[in-house]
Swiss-Prot record:
DNA-binding region: 104-198
Descriptive protein name: Forkhead box protein D4
Gene Ontology molecular function: any one: RNA polymerase II cis-regulatory region sequence-specific DNA binding
Organism: Homo sapiens
Keyword NAD: no
Length: 439
């Protein structure tokens, strides 16, 4: 059947058939060739149908058939022979593989963390160090590493037996340290990590209890903590001065307590007066700060007392009829006791208040002189001498009050006989600055 068509036609003998008349007739070769063509087409179709199941089985199995099977035309009779190597392994192989996996340790996560912390040299570890110890010690957790790391973190945060220790600033690394509470050492029975006695709970301090101070408190701080101090605490600390009790102080000015609404301008103690004060704080306790000298209540009372005495003597001396006081710049020139009005630095006009006081005193003196002239009796020499003595005594009192302050200075008498000595008020720069401040 595989021979060429021309050779088959040549080799095929011509059949001789007799007709009904008995004569030999020739066979039509064309009709035989058509039959052979039909047979050949049918055989070719049969081969294709027989090869199709083999191809489908090969496609199902996922492998290509060799060329010899296709050319031979013989397909496998059982399609189940293909893909046998892709079947699931038997149950015995799966059981043997499970038997090879390591078993889970019987210890809990708290026991594993405690084991990791106790084996460290410093008895503290970070979260990564605890996980590394568990992975190296137990192969079961080595195969399932990412799953149980969160469980370790939660057990560290939720159990009171673990204490977080912050990392030192200069120590390299990341994360805080974890350690065991010293009171939780007997958490497990006889050191066995398989069984825990009870859940450890840290004792919380009561709300009313105060923690002991690591350092002794000063007297003022102790008085604040204890509203009813006993006899051992000693006297309470002196009250601190109020910030708004002093005026704005500048360079070269000394603060003073405003005890009177109109403080004296020239009654201020300078540095030598402070230096001459007795040193009372030599034997005092060094821990108790000494109050500022100008803020001492005794000094303030003494200043107020001296101010009142100074004002009283000033009024008494102003009422003396034997003295004539003239203010510089007032336009009147009379002999006798002369007082110069101090002018602060930078001031352009003379002291108006002192000029007004001088005018008032002059008017009173003129009135007394007119009364004496009306009575017809001139002032005697004794009266003049008494006035001089009263002026000298007043000057001595001024010097006693302002001793060491450099406020007053006695000058040589001006004029001849019968004239009063002249004293000039020469304020220091500090007193000038104080007088320029708010009164």
């Amino acid at each position: 059947m595989n021979l060429p068509r021309a050779e088959r036609l040549r080799s095929t003998p011509q059949r001789s058939l007799r007709d009904s008349d008995g004569e030999d007739g020739k066979i039509d070769v064309l009709g035989e060739e058509e039959d052979e063509d039909e047979e050949e087409a049918a055989s070719q179709q049969f081969l294709e149908q027989s090869l199709q199941p083999g191809l489908q089985v090969a496609r199902w199995g996922g492998v290509a058939l060799p060329r010899e099977h296709i050319e031979g035309g013989g397909g496998p009779s059982d399609p189940s022979e293909f893909g046998t190597e892709f079947r699931a392994p038997p149950r015995s192989a799966a059981a043997s593989e499970d038997a090879r996996q390591p078993a889970k340790p019987p210890s809990s996560y708290i026991a594993l963390i405690t084991m990791a912390i106790l084996q460290s040299p410093h008895k503290r570890l970070t979260l990564s160090g605890i996980c590394a110890f568990i992975s190296d010690r137990f192969p079961y957790y080595r195969r399932k590493f990412p799953a149980w790391q969160n469980s370790i973190r939660h057990n560290l945060s939720l159990n009171d037996c673990f204490v977080k220790i912050p990392r030192e600033p200069g120590r390299p690394g990341k994360g805080n340290y974890w350690s065991l509470d010293p009171a939780s050492q007997d958490m497990f029975d006889n050191g066995s990590f398989l069984r825990r006695r009870k859940r450890f709970q840290r004792h919380q301090p009561t709300p009313g209890a105060h923690l002991p101070h690591p350092f002794p408190l000063p007297a003022a701080h102790a008085a604040l903590h204890n509203p009813r101090p006993g006899p051992l605490l000693g006297a309470p600390a002196p009250p601190q001065p109020v910030p708004g009790a002093y005026p704005n102080t500048g360079p070269g000015r000394r603060p003073y307590a405003l005890l009177h609404p109109h403080p004296p301008r020239y009654l201020l103690l300078s540095a030598p007066a402070y230096a001459g004060a007795p040193k009372k704080a030599e034997g005092a306790d060094l821990a108790t700060p000494a109050p500022f000298p100008c803020c001492s209540p005794h000094l303030v009372l003494s200043l107020g007392r001296r101010a009142r005495v100074w004002r009283r003597h000033r009024e008494a001396d102003a009422s003396l009829s034997a003295l004539r006081v003239s203010c510089k710049g007032s336009g009147e020139r009379v002999q006798g006791l002369r007082r110069v009005c101090p002018r602060p630095r930078g001031a352009t006009a003379p002291c108006s208040s002192d000029r007004q006081a001088c005018r008032t005193i002059l008017q009173q003196q003129q009135r007394h002189q007119e009364e004496d002239c009306a009575n017809g009796c001139a002032p005697t020499k004794g009266a003049v001498l008494g006035g001089h003595l009263s002026a000298a005594s007043a000057l001595l009192r001024y010097q006693a009050v302002a001793e060491g302050s450099g406020l007053t200075s006695l000058a040589a008498p001006l004029g001849g006989e019968g004239t009063s000595p002249v004293f000039l008020v020469s304020p220091t720069p500090s007193s000038l600055a104080e007088s320029a401040g708010p009164s």
